[in-house]
């Protein structure tokens, strides 16, 4: 009984609901953060949301979008701190956390996409992950990053073209 009550109180105080936490985890994982560091990344997002409230700032209009952008920024910070090659295997493992029965083709495609993401510039990778993996609309991405919508669209276009070229170059698709 006490555990249920404690859990309920904890859930009420948690600035992120379960769906937002899953989205943050996905953005971090797709941004290259290793599985072992995902809980720390989620805690960082929670902490930043609580710090924002403690400083008297209004809550973000869309907490889910705000949290996804913060998670994306954390992933970019992590990228700057580590060499990309060291974490490629960990990243693929985190993407396969919820494995579906699949063939060798899917594994090859996953590896090629991960390598393609690694080769993109940080800003292009960020908007690509936020748009297609966090499922944020262009307008939300632009607002959260503080850039014009046209800039987001341009980065998306360039990133998709580069990723598509990489996949065709490797004869994956």
Predicted regions span which residues?
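DNA-recognition helix of helix-turn-helix
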Residues: 72, 76, 139, 145-170
């Amino acid at each position: 009984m006490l555990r249920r009550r404690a859990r309920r109180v904890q859930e009420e105080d948690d600035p992120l609901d379960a769906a937002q936490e899953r989205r943050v985890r996905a953005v971090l994982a797709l941004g290259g953060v290793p599985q072992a560091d995902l809980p720390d990344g989620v805690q960082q997002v929670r902490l930043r949301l609580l710090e924002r409230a403690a400083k008297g700032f209004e809550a973000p209009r869309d907490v889910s979008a705000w949290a996804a952008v913060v998670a994306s920024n954390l992933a970019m910070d992590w990228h700057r701190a580590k060499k990309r090659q060291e974490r490629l295997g960990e990243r693929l493992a985190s993407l396969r956390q919820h494995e579906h029965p699949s063939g060798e083709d899917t594994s090859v495609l996953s590896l090629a996409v991960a390598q393609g993401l690694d080769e993109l510039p940080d800003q292009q990778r960020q908007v690509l992950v936020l748009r297609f993996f966090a499922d944020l609309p262009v307008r939300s991405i632009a607002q959260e990053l503080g850039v014009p919508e046209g800039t987001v669209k341009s980065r998306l276009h360039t990133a998709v073209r580069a990723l598509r070229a990489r996949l065709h170059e490797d004869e994956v698709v």
